[in-house]
Amino acid sequence: MLDIKFLRTNFEEVKAKLQHRGEDLTDFGRFEELDTRRRELLVQTEELKSKRNEVSQQISVLKREKKDAEALILEMREVGEKVKDLDNELRTVEEDLERLMLSIPNIPHESAPVGETEDDNVVARTWGEVKEFTYEPKPHWDLATDLGILDFERAGKVTGSRFVFYKGAGARLERALISFMLDLHTDEHGYEEVLPPYMVNRASMTGTGQLPKFEEDAFRIESEDYFLIPTAEVPVTNMHRDEILNKEQLPIRYAAFSSCFRSEAGSAGRDTRGLIRQHQFNKVELVKFVKPEDSYEELEKLTNDAERVLQLLELPYRVMSMCTGDLGFTAAKKYDIEVWIPSYGTYREISSCSNFEAFQARRANIRFRREPNGKPEHVHTLNGSGLAIGRTVAAILENYQQEDGTIIIPEVLRPYMGGKTVIK
């Protein structure tokens, strides 16, 4: 959520920056109307309440003096009715304003490339050499099915499309990657491990920006009004909702493994085979709470931490600086890390690393004090995938495949795989 005072005093500047996102700003113009009316109603209500108090005191005086107070009593009733009507209108205006504020996306950072679509994203850097195959590389779903380590068909029978059973060496590879990533981020990168709930309430989904705008993308448990988490970012960020932190606690860095659940409502017909786009998938998420002046340095560190996973796995990748039209709703700046997938002949996203500045913290009321008695300020929050496990499995299967269909296990994972070197 944006700062309403900043929006009020910089309305045209904010509008111009949001236009770079390519957002429909039809409702945005109502901000000035609603904000002005809200302030008018506050003034009118306070004036009438003040008058009501004065009249009440006058009535008390007249009654003590045993004088007729009927006219003033009628006047106070009229004032009370007006106050009630104004309070009702104020409540409606504030609810409308709140809904509008929750629907306004974050302001792009000045360093985000200006553009409309993913074609306008900018390559920040690349790492590793793309392998040249002397044979036609197989897609990971064919490799895994032939090896008996992934079973999409039976998962479709048990649940439906976009689900999978991991079996044997496939299940162990998934588990190895989870442990490897958590060990790396906690032991070498300084994150504290967190294992979060997989269900959250509506306030949590609103705090991180999934609601109200993207409710159709979420799996909701109607009986409890809980939501299955689309990412560990949601519960982990909301750990500190409605809290005031001390300056000494910052930065806070969490690494959280979780399963993630997404309806993929807007992805019909895309990536229908394999592990790239599943309704349920595993991910290690990195979440940070930092002082505002440190957040862009911390974004670079977070992105580097996610990159390190791919470097140790020796998987070629590139880092994209996302343009203003491809930032997503909550980010002020975002990097996507894309790993090379041979069967696609291109790079595919495996991590998004974002700085939300105070956007989430304002929605979730997460603040800190620089001094013990200082005025609370909103922290800046960041998060990034470190990494998406299923897509990492897909990248390993395809990049490490041999002509006979076996898979070389990356050296860094072998201790987690019982010393095995090949999946066959």
Swiss-Prot record:
The keyword Transmembrane helix does not apply. Gene3D superfamilies: Bira Bifunctional Protein, Domain 2, Serine-tRNA synthetase, tRNA binding domain. One of its GO terms (biological process) is seryl-tRNA aminoacylation. It comes from the Bacteria. CDD domains: SerRS_core. One of its GO terms (cellular component) is cytoplasm. One of its GO terms (molecular function) is ATP binding. ATP binds at R262, S263, E264, E349, I350, S351, S352. NCBIfam families: serS. Homodimer. The tRNA molecule binds across the dimer. Belongs to the class-II aminoacyl-tRNA synthetase family. Type-1 seryl-tRNA synthetase subfamily. Consists of two distinct domains, a catalytic core and a N-terminal extension that is involved in tRNA binding. This is Serine--tRNA ligase. It comes from Bacillus cereus (strain ATCC 14579 / DSM 31 / CCUG 7414 / JCM 2152 / NBRC 15305 / NCIMB 9373 / NCTC 2599 / NRRL B-3711). The lineage of its organism: Bacteria, Bacillati, Bacillota, Bacilli, Bacillales.
